[in-house]
Amino acid sequence: MIDKTYLESVCAAQSLPFSPELSEKLDQYAQLLVEWNEKMNLTAITEPNDIAVKHFADSLLLLNALDIPKNASLIDVGTGAGFPSVPVGLARPDLKVTLLDSLQKRITFLETLCAQLSLPAVCVHGR
């Protein structure tokens, strides 16, 4: 579904982690995002190549922008559909990722997503 070659080349050019497992999980993420987006408005970006460029690559580039220590805890306030925290958490499984959003419907999506991707993120609904 997504352009895995593009993501692999972006990650290689930036010395970012990229593996077949990450590629598969990002593809699953894109499929779930498009599927759930038909029921609720999660994102305006739903074309596979756009998801790869504007959601996944942009999120993964954050790993070079920030010096995130090993085993650090991150919180994504207003996470929406999980960007940038879910791709970052998938690329860096040592991180403890907390997802915070004010809408329960988004949290429901994120809990389903994290369960299917085996990402042990903590999802929090708060208002």
Language model region names:
Residues A13-S15, K39-L42, P48-N49, V53, ...:
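Generic secondary-structure boundary/loop-capping signal
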Residues M1-I45:
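N-terminal auxiliary segments of SAM/dcSAM-dependent transferases
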Residues L60-R127:
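Conserved SAM/SAH cofactor-binding pocket of Class I
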Residues L42-I68:
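SAM-dependent Rossmann-like transferase core, predominantly class I methyltransferases
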Residues L22, Y29, I51, D76-V77:
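Residues at the start of alpha-helices and the adjacent loop-to-helix junctions
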Residues E21, E47-D50, T98:
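Conserved short-loop catalytic and cofactor-binding motifs
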